[in-house]
Amino acid sequence: MAEPGHSHHLSARVRGRTERRIPRLWRLLLWAGTAFQVTQGTGPELHACKESEYHYEYTACDSTGSRWRVAVPHTPGLCTSLPDPIKGTECSFSCNAGEFLDMKDQSCKPCAEGRYSLGTGIRFDEWDELPHGFASLSANMELDDSAAESTGNCTSSKWVPRGDYIASNTDECTATLMYAVNLKQSGTVNFEYYYPDSSIIFEFFVQNDQCQPNADDSRWMKTTEKGWEFHSVELNRGNNVLYWRTTAFSVWTKVPKPVLVRNIAITGVAYTSECFPCKPGTYADKQGSSFCKLCPANSYSNKGETSCHQCDPDKYSEKGSSSCNVRPACTDKDYFYTHTACDANGETQLMYKWAKPKICSEDLEGAVKLPASGVKTHCPPCNPGFFKTNNSTCQPCPYGSYSNGSDCTRCPAGTEPAVGFEYKWWNTLPTNMETTVLSGINFEYKGMTGWEVAGDHIYTAAGASDNDFMILTLVVPGFRPPQSVMADTENKEVARITFVFETLCSVNCELYFMVGVNSRTNTPVETWKGSKGKQSYTYIIEENTTTSFTWAFQRTTFHEASRKYTNDVAKIYSINVTNVMNGVASYCRPCALEASDVGSSCTSCPAGYYIDRDSGTCHSCPTNTILKAHQPYGVQACVPCGPGTKNNKIHSLCYNDCTFSRNTPTRTFNYNFSALANTVTLAGGPSFTSKGLKYFHHFTLSLCGNQGRKMSVCTDNVTDLRIPEGESGFSKSITAYVCQAVIIPPEVTGYKAGVSSQPVSLADRLIGVTTDMTLDGITSPAELFHLESLGIPDVIFFYRSNDVTQSCSSGRSTTIRVRCSPQKTVPGSLLLPGTCSDGTCDGCNFHFLWESAAACPLCSVADYHAIVSSCVAGIQKTTYVWREPKLCSGGISLPEQRVTICKTIDFWLKVGISAGTCTAILLTVLTCYFWKKNQKLEYKYSKLVMNATLKDCDLPAADSCAIMEGEDVEDDLIFTSKKSLFGKIKSFTSKRTPDGFDSVPLKTSSGGLDMDL
């Protein structure tokens, strides 16, 4: 699509050529008419032109800078005898502001009363409709052809005239307001703008007649601090196209406030041949005016007036009105109550006042009267830290003392004042607070009181209209946090503000709480819509600098000047700010004592040390505990760290050093997540607004390590898009363990980088690391992700954020499931829940799954086994391999292969066969031997039995057997007890006679002496 300014540039050039041709065309027509009259002498005779029938114009400037003044009839052909052309003024000639060029005598004359001029300029201050020459265009940010359909959704997203100003769009479309002008000399363009919301990109730039933009130093507009601001840019001679362009980047439910522009003035244009009448509601009471004044309240004026007219008594008008309105009857919505300051008697008066400006009438039927004032009541006590003087005013107690609102008391020895501001009694507005009213119609401050004191609370008074912003501001010069807090670079809390409030509304009222740092634009922190019961809100302050806190209440957003809902109010009961520099104290807190020559004095404990209340000495917190730095009293101030975490050196936070252990009945699993310590990013699926703008939720995560330092950074660069590469600019950023931002990619925006906006912290502190699904009230449902299939439970990191919102009363929480996935190399992959593509299903609890091989347990001896090879060539190898599937990472390495000397199976086979053969032979020999031996013994035994039966023998019984044939006389037969095999062998070898026969001893049955036969 062509650049919008290009077509306007062309039209400007065409218009310039047309302007140069006009005088020549008129002269040609006049010459043709005269010639026609001469040739047609019989035609009707034309009268001489009167001054009212023609006007003067200049011809185009020639190369020498000269031009001619010519008379041009209003209607060609009606008259004749026009004045002859004469030499005109120099092309560079111009009149001053408040003057116009009288073309008759070519001199500057002052404007008459009721009129004004800018000299060589033009002004646009009426925006009931788009002025002539302006163009309003809209486009979708998508640059590709796929956005053609969504572009149609942006046709109505344009700049809208609203009477005194023109307002930009508030959606994600790009709206452009353009004006083309041809300058005869160098000039300026200046305008007023109201730019309160940084979620809109607002740029103003100028293109010259070569369609080249001028210097970009003033292109990107800065947000306005208070009300309207003035902006001016120099213009070069020639064609200039002015662009006011806005694009909103608020893709959530919050609708940003539009950019407003008014009073556009351009100088350096062609001469002004007449003065402009003052618009209704303004006047010029003297000649030579360069601007018109506004009519005061209760007066009006018509167009071109020299003075304003007073309204009738029964009518009223606001400042700059063109008419008067009838005063309505006064109601109870037209007045409010307040309290006077305490008098010398310690009493205050209840006062009723009409809301300003008073537009109602007390004389009409049914009108209410202002209630009687002057009822006296006793003054409430002073606020804590203040004391009451003799004239019943409240003054702050000196440093080193405290009070509950009565008398000041010195802090006891061993204590120090806890300085701050605690406002809970509202008899007068504190000196460091101010209140005003910002008009919801023209966004100008009215110098009125927006909040009124009412004893035990402060509330919103009645404004000029229901859409006015009732503003209350508290300014704190700085903070004085404890020394232990200042030493902790990761703990961002330097102080906190707590206030109790309620809203009572019948329509769509809104209460805004905003914070400004170093006088920068107030940033909305929280918004409450509709009626809210009495409740408390706490905001943590993270920067030690001058800070302003602002409460703004708007009864309705309807763009009308009416006062119908003044009974809709916001009330603030108390405001408490801690650790305020030069503040006051309502109590004294224990401190560490330091001995000196003059006694003992308070000193600060080192970081990570608590104060013993009894002795005033400093003691280090135990291991694995952190110190509550803002209340470091007693050992109970040391809070234990969660599972899987430990404290840092100064006991300010608990962190995980990227290690974890899980015990089971059979073994201990150790983890090391060091490979996952670096920050990683993850983008959710694309989302689209109602206008078709594509955006992503972009997450940045830092899991562990780094001594607990938060490494994830999310930024808001909406107002910093045009900073050149290599240069730094201001952009809001937050640091956390896990943060989220809304990203519009560069291919959509067309800028050098994608737009990052609305950064949010999701994890400010680590609660613990465990395999349990619930910890400290935070649950990580397993069903949000695909189930684990390896039998190794997920290790879950639990975090909490410090941000507390209406929808997340306990703050946001984040869980990161770290799952062992051996096939995914480092760093692995991050996943969002399948059912909640933005990481959360409720907006408060965010869940992530991180799968990686680095999430597996460390390898140990239980994760591998040995494989022994066969013996080859006398060598045997033992190889160690991982068990499959391998479910570990890192840890120990596999042992080296082990080589041993061995015997082959052939050798052992030969040895076995040889041993078997020998054994068989030996057994055979022994068997034969014993068989033969047994045969001999059997034979001898049978002989003895036979001899024992010979009872009829004549000879006396012999003690030995007879010598048989073939037997040796020397053989002895002895009956012995049973012998073993080896005993028999021994006997055999020892009794063998030299002749080869055995000697067997015999034993008689009577046990007598052995006898040799």
Swiss-Prot record:
Cell compartments where the protein resides: Cell membrane; Late endosome membrane; Golgi apparatus, trans-Golgi network membrane; Lysosome membrane
Entry's family note: Belongs to the ELAPOR family.
UniProt entry tagged with the keyword Secreted: no
Known glycosylation sites: N153, N404, N672
Induction remarks: By estrogen replacement therapy.
Oligomeric form and interacting partners: Interacts with HSPA5; may regulate the function of HSPA5 in apoptosis and cell proliferation.
Function: May protect cells from cell death by inducing cytosolic vacuolization and up-regulating the autophagy pathway. May play a role in apoptosis and cell proliferation through its interaction with HSPA5.
Cited InterPro entries: Elapor1-like_3rd, Elapor1/2, Elapor1/2_C, Elapor1/2_GBD, Elapor1/2_MRH, Elapor1/2_TNFR-like, Growth_fac_rcpt_cys_sf, Man6P_isomerase_rcpt-bd_dom_sf
UniProt membrane topology term: Single-pass type I membrane protein; Single-pass membrane protein
Single GO cellular component term: lysosomal membrane
Protein name: Endosome/lysosome-associated apoptosis and autophagy regulator 1
Tissue: Expressed in normal endometrium but overexpressed in endometroid tumors.
Organism this protein belongs to: Homo sapiens
Gene Ontology biological-process annotations: autophagosome assembly; cellular response to starvation; positive regulation of autophagosome assembly; positive regulation of vacuole organization
Main location: membrane
Disulfide bonds: C278-C295, C308-C330, C311-C342, C658-C704, C714-C739, C808-C844, C820-C856
Transmembrane intervals: 911-931
Signal peptide: 1-41
Pfam families on file: ELAPOR1_C, GBD_ELAPOR1, GBD_ELAPOR1-like_3rd, MRH_ELAPOR1_9th, TNFR_ELAPOR1_6th
Key words, A-Z: Autophagy, Cell membrane, Disulfide bond, Endoplasmic reticulum, Endosome, Glycoprotein, Golgi apparatus, Lysosome, Membrane, Signal, Transmembrane, Transmembrane helix
Molecular functions per Gene Ontology: RNA binding
Keyword Magnesium among record annotations: no
Membrane-side (Cytoplasmic) residue stretches: 932-1013
